[in-house]
Structure formats: structure tokens, C-alpha cells
Amino acid sequence: MRMLRDNPDNVDVRIYGTNVLRDAPALTACDVAEVEPRHVSDADYAEFALEFCRRHRIDVLIPPRRLVALAGLVDDFAAVGTRLMCSPPAAVEVLTSKSRTYEVAAEAGVPVPPWRVVSDAEGFRDAVRELSATGERICIKPAGEYSAFGFRILDDGPLRIKDLLAPPLPLASVAAVADALRRAADEDEAIPEFLVMPYLDGPEVSVDCLSAPGGATLSAIARSKQGRYRHLLDDPALTAIARRLVGHFQLAYLSNVQLRHRGGEPVLLEANPRASAGIFQTALSGVNLPWAAVRLLVSGDAGPLPAPRLGGRLAVTEIATEVDGGTPLALIERPAPAPDPVRVLAEIDTAPGAAPRARREAELLLGEETAKAG
């Protein structure tokens, strides 16, 4: 959003944003913010988006999600005065499925890793057995558009001390995953398709692309990600893969291609027909991709696109943002601890010689309580 405001044409931009969470931090950067519906059908979401744009007289809609619901409605949005920034519906439909993405990309000559689609325990075990024959570690993830939360590295090895001292990894055993699939089938639980493939553990390369309708790439900026650091890469081989994929799918405006290396060669990890969440990092290259995309959508001209400054290294840091509303975290109420039981001494005997006996009894009791505390 900052890149849109800091545009080279000095256009005063007013930003409207929606999120399913009322207190989403991103909404604090918007001039107008509203809550959007959660868990609704594509048709209902599209109706919400159209009504929002009509009510607020939105000039340009840049959807970061629910693209399948919106991609085929370019004319509907135009009817309410809004230009929709989106790639063709056919491309969006394919790219929201990782398995279909790999199939079509491989046909286009884009290098992809070996993969198998599974949805049951037997197919999963067969896929692991086949793909692990190369000696590579294997992983599993949902085959749909968003897979980060379902990603697991398969590991049947014993836990070692060095594992306990290292940052945690999303590990799961083959047996545990197979049991989960079998249990879901026995309980008639809906099972999505999963992708089984080699685990590519090198630095991820993300290529942010700007392209004209029809898929002609106008700019492609590659950056590697390792921890909190990013490198703006000057590597034509990486951007060439992204250009080929963007051209084959005829992607328009903003898209993102993610690569990793396997055996020293770059292969496709995934592709998204939308801007990446990290596109703001490309600002340090000197190219304002989001604003160029808006210009391209509105006027058909992306404007001057300087050669990106590559080779730089940057760090992604955190900032604290105040948000409105929300419910404070409640302290867990715990019952008051019960008082320790009081031991009552026998009635004090005042007879001669009773004092030493009472002292000995008290010492025994005190010794008993001390032992309990220890």
C-alpha cells in the first residue's frame, strides 16, 4: 500500500480495504476499512465485492484472495465503474491447484519436481515409497491454493538432542499421516487432495512479475529468502523460468512465481496469479511494480520501467501497529488454594514432666511438615 501511495506520478491514492478480521493490522493502513464475509460461497463473495465497489465507487480492485470467485466478472465490475486487476479465469482455475499447475507447467517446458497426488493411506504410502527411492527427504502438503498450514516434512527417524536444540520443524511420520488418512476415511470425513514430493530445503526464490494482458512480461524481479534476509538476485535463468510460465498462462498485471533448487537446478515450487505478500520488498530495486500495474490496467501503459537495481541485500523487520477494538486477553481464573490442614495437638497436660513430652510431639509434627515440603 505504501508503494501505491508513493507512486512516481504523485497521484493522490485513497485505499479501501477489507478483511475477515475487524482488527487485522493491514486495515490500519487503509483510508476506509470494512469486514468482509467469511466462509461464504463464491457467488456470495462476488456479490459482496460488487456491492462494495458500487457503494464506494472503487476505481481499481486488486483482489489478494478469492480469485476464482472474481476472475470471470470483469464486465460485471466494469458495469459498476470498477476495473478488476485479474488474470484470465482459466489460468486462475489451474493455478489454484498445485497438481494442475505442475501438469500444465511441465507441458510448457517449465522444470518441475516429481510429485504425486494422494487422498488415501494406500496411495500415500505408495507415493512415499516411490519418491524416496532417490534418497531425498519427502514432504506432503495440500494440493489447493494455500498449503503453508498443511505442510509437513516426513521423518521416521528418532528424535535426537540436536533436534531438541534446533528450531522446530513441521515434522510428521509416515505412519502418523497414513493413520490420519485412514481414520478420516473410516469416519467419512472429507479428505482433500494432497501433494507428495521431494522436500526442497534450499533458499526459496520468489519472482515478482509485471505483465501485460496476454502474458508479455514487462518486468521480473527475483529475490531469495533466507530467514529475515532477502537478496535481490541478478540471475536471468531464474527470471526466464518465470517469464515462460507467465507467458504460457497468459497472466496479466501482477503475479508471483516461486522456485527452489533440486540437484543444483531451479524448479517450480508454485505460481500465483496475484501479487505476492512480499512484493513491497521489491521497492528497493527502484521499480514500483504495484503502481505500474495500476497504470497498465487504467490506461494500457505501465509508464517508464527502469532497469531494477539488483544484487542488494535487505532485512525484513517487524514494527508494532496499534489496532482498534479487539477483546483483551482474559486472565484464567483459578480457585483459591485450600488452606493447609491444621494439626491440633492433644490437650496440654500440666502435670509434672508434661512439657518435655509436648515439646517432643511438636518437634515431630514440625519435622513431618518439613519433610512434606521438601
Model-derived features with residue positions:
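Peripheral (often C-terminal) accessory segments that flank ATP-dependent C-N-forming ligase machineries
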Residues: 262, 292-374
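Glycine-rich phosphate/pyrophosphate-binding beta-alpha loops
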Residues: 147-148, 223-231, 272-286
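Active-site "cap" helix and flanking loop/linker of ATP-utilizing ligase/carboxylase catalytic domains
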Residues: 236-262, 274-324
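ATP-binding N-terminal substructure of ATP-dependent carboxylate-amine bond-forming enzymes
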Residues: 1-90, 371-372
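Phosphate-binding site of ATP-dependent enzymes
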Residues: 164-245, 249, 260-261, 265-267
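Active-site nucleotide/adenylate-binding loops and adjacent lid/helix of ATP-dependent enzymes
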Residues: 94-193
